[in-house]
Regions:
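Bacterial Sec-dependent N-terminal signal peptides
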Residues: 1-26
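Sequence signature of WD/YWTD-type beta-propeller architectures
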Residues: 21-492
Length: 492
């Protein structure tokens, strides 16, 4: 009898202990403000099927977070723990059910044994599909004088799975950069390798070629690429790049070109298609991109400064020239599409939307390498009206830089240092039929605060990909080190 009594007493004490330390909200005190969460997902717009927007609540002495998400068109889910960690399948089902609707998020936290409930906030589910498997990007550790650890990576946007495409641990001492697929289709994939084993890699339908890094007739490497929509051509700039360092606190690194030109490459014939209009003396042409119909080549150009001390006087305009894909020939004149120099600014990273309506670009004070320019901001040019405007709805006080469109032209991915001012993160925003953008959201992570606090990598040159990139990295590493290269020739 005594044994039974002791067991019963222990059970009562245990039950009282559980009641005294409840894991879910009870008698929560209302707080007249929304929660401070990381990442800031309050009021963002997301696509159906995106990875769960897990978040932490910022504040001292918070030992429990309870989050309930309710759909305006039905459905709900619940997370309870150290942070809001939602089930992937349940999240997908909820976003699918509420396409074009909204999610209401109720957040409670436990502090000092008491529960607090914040005001609800909304997450909007876009009516526009993402239509992409994921994103590709370069992830690079800080380093100024040598090529530190970096690699090209891909991330499934429906979950948290990341995989390396090619990592420079497999080719030590080499810099991997400037990758691009064709309208988000990785069956045509290109990137540049800089270093002692430099090359330009072009992969078409699984077949790789390593082009000589430099053609003596070009005077520089094949660097910034962009595919023709037909896949028959790839535009490049040829850059003699130099890196410098500022002594001003907010200005760290400067990247400039001693010279650069633009040309189109034909992979089938290994021919470089030049034109004197794109290789002008005393001018630098850079960052070429094709229009969605393939009949126009956009690029940026600036007057070179003979005195390198005057690098802040190098400012780029946006230009265009006609291109005939059937003949592989250019038009007979160049037009200035946007005069940034007249504004005292410099334009970089032009990216036309695939529906042909808009052109996204970055505006900075000088130069073209905007990643470290705190003043850099994104602009949108309406190709039908010629009007351009700063994207105030997505810009921040810190560097907002490189960007790309998804295939249906309703989503963009871009880099920004708005999080901490030091590291570039990936952000996504949707755009409607009138060119209006929604509040951006940061790339979701399973453990967001832990991931971004502990990460020493910046994300840059992001692009969408409609399927996983297939790339045999081990074979490719051997090919890089072998220095076997395919030569290129200038078309007569």
């Amino acid at each position: 009898m005594r044994k039974v009594f002791l067991i019963g007493l222990a059970g009562v004490v245990g039950l009282l202990g559980l009641v005294g330390c409840r894991q879910e909200p009870a008698d929560a005190v209302m707080v007249k403000q929304q929660p401070a969460i990381y990442p800031d997902y309050i009021g963002v717009t997301i696509p159906v099927g995106i990875a769960p927007l897990n978040f932490n609540v910022i504040g001292e002495d918070i030992d429990r977070v309870d989050a309930k998400v309710t759909g305006s068109k039905g459905g709900a889910l619940h997370a309870n723990g150290e942070y809001a960690d939602f089930d992937i399948d349940e999240w997908h089902q909820l976003t699918e059910q509420n396409k074009g609707g909204e999610l209401t998020v109720t957040v409670c936290v436990r502090k000092g044994g008491k529960w607090l409930q914040y005001q609800d906030f909304k997450i909007y589910v876009s009516p526009y599909a993402l239509e992409e498997w994921g994103v590709t990007y370069r992830r690079i550790a800080p380093g100024y004088e040598v090529y530190s650890h970096m690699g090209l990576y891909q991330r499934d946007l429906s979950n948290f799975e990341e995989a390396a495409i090619f990592d420079n641990r497999q080719v030590p001492g080499q810099c991997l950069n400037c990758h691009m697929s064709n309208r988000t289709d990785p069956s045509r994939f290109v990137f540049h390798v800089r270093g002692d084993h430099g090359a330009t890699m072009i992969q078409i339908d699984g077949k790789r070629e390593w082009l000589k890094a430099k053609n003596d007739l070009l005077g520089g490497s094949m660097v910034y690429p962009y595919w023709h929509p037909s896949g028959r051509y790839c535009a490049f700039s040829t850059n003699q790049t130099r890196q410098g360092y500022h002594i001003v606190e907010k200005e760290r690194i400067e990247v400039k070109d001693l010279s650069s030109d633009v040309f189109v490459y034909n992979p089938a014939t290994h021919e470089i298609i030049e034109d004197s209009l794109l290789q002008t003396k005393d001018w630098s042409e850079n960052s070429p991109v094709f229009s969605p119909d393939g009949k126009t080549l956009y690029y940026i150009t600036c007057k070179q400064q003979s005195d390198q001390v005057r690098f802040k006087d190098e400012k780029y305009n946006l230009c265009k020239i006609a291109f005939d894909p059937d003949k592989g020939t250019y038009g007979d004149h160049v037009d200035t599409l946007f005069n940034a120099v007249a504004m005292g600014k410099s334009l970089t990273w032009p990216r036309p939307s695939y529906d042909g309506k808009y052109l996204l670009f970055t505006l900075i004070d000088y130069g073209y390498f905007s990643i470290w320019h705190e003043e850099s901001e994104q602009w949108l040019l309406n190709l039908q009206t010629g009007e351009a405007r700063p994207l105030k709805e997505i810009n921040s006080p810190r560097a907002d830089s490189y960007h790309n469109w998804n295939v249906n032209s309703h989503w963009i991915v871009f880099t920004s240092r708005r999080d901490d001012g030091l590291y570039s993160r990936l952000y996504f925003a949707s755009v409607d039929d009138k060119g209006r953008f929604t509040k951006p959201f940061m790339l979701p992570q399973r453990h967001p605060k832990e991931y971004y606090d502990e990460s020493v990598y910046s994300f840059n040159t992001p692009d969408f990909t409609k399927q996983k990139v297939v790339f045999r990295a081990r074979e490719a590493a051997s090919e890089v080190i072998s220095d076997k290269r395919v030569g290129t020739k200038v078309r007569p």
